[in-house]
Amino acid sequence: MAPDQTSVKGQLIVLTGPSGVGKGTLVQLLLERQPHWFLSISATTRSPRAGEVDGQSYYFLTKEEFQTWIGEEKLLEWAEYAGNYYGTPRQPVEEQIAQGKTVLLEIEVLGARQIKQTFPSARRIFILPPSVEVLEERLRGRGSDSETAIAKRLAQAQQELQAAAEFDYQVVNDDLDQALHRLVKLIGEEE
């Protein structure tokens, strides 16, 4: 870190919402527009999907490793979702914010609630599907989950959708370009 950046403070942006709502696609598009922003890589105990790379897509951990990270306070937040653990490694986020960067977290709803306690200044944005039917189509379109997993994710989504009003902003991902435009406006083109 350069000496003149020690007093600069970045911002933490949390994107959350049900599985299949399009958080990952929106984050990818945001980073294409703002490549200087930093995407925090989450840790998880779930198995990698096709094309996912350890240390790039997620940090893939065993449940024992994840429990160790919790005990050593290496996570800003963590939650269990659909039988797996997810969490945000603390160190890279704190380093990037200290350097004045905008840090994006793409995390589950339970974790996003914890962030309000850890980082009260974080802007928490809930991404909504246009309807539950569209959400189900998106989950099935992935082709990576069993019927049981899809049913669990849809049941979880119903609960999460009821929590949308708890968050600072809500963005409906009906039209990708419009949702992206709204996010850029909420976050700010430049810090």
Swiss-Prot record:
Localization, UniProt: Cytoplasm
Gene Ontology molecular function terms on file: ATP binding; guanylate kinase activity
Record keywords: ATP-binding, Cytoplasm, Kinase, Nucleotide-binding, Transferase
Major localization listed first in the record, in broad terms: cytoplasm
InterPro entries: GK/Ca_channel_bsu (IPR008145), Guanylate_kin-like_dom (IPR008144), Guanylate_kinase (IPR017665), Guanylate_kinase_CS (IPR020590), P-loop_NTPase (IPR027417)
Catalyses which reaction(s): GMP + ATP = GDP + ADP
General function of this protein: Essential for recycling GMP and indirectly, cGMP.
HAMAP family: Guanylate_kinase
Name of the featured protein: Guanylate kinase
Species name: Synechocystis sp. (strain ATCC 27184 / PCC 6803 / Kazusa)
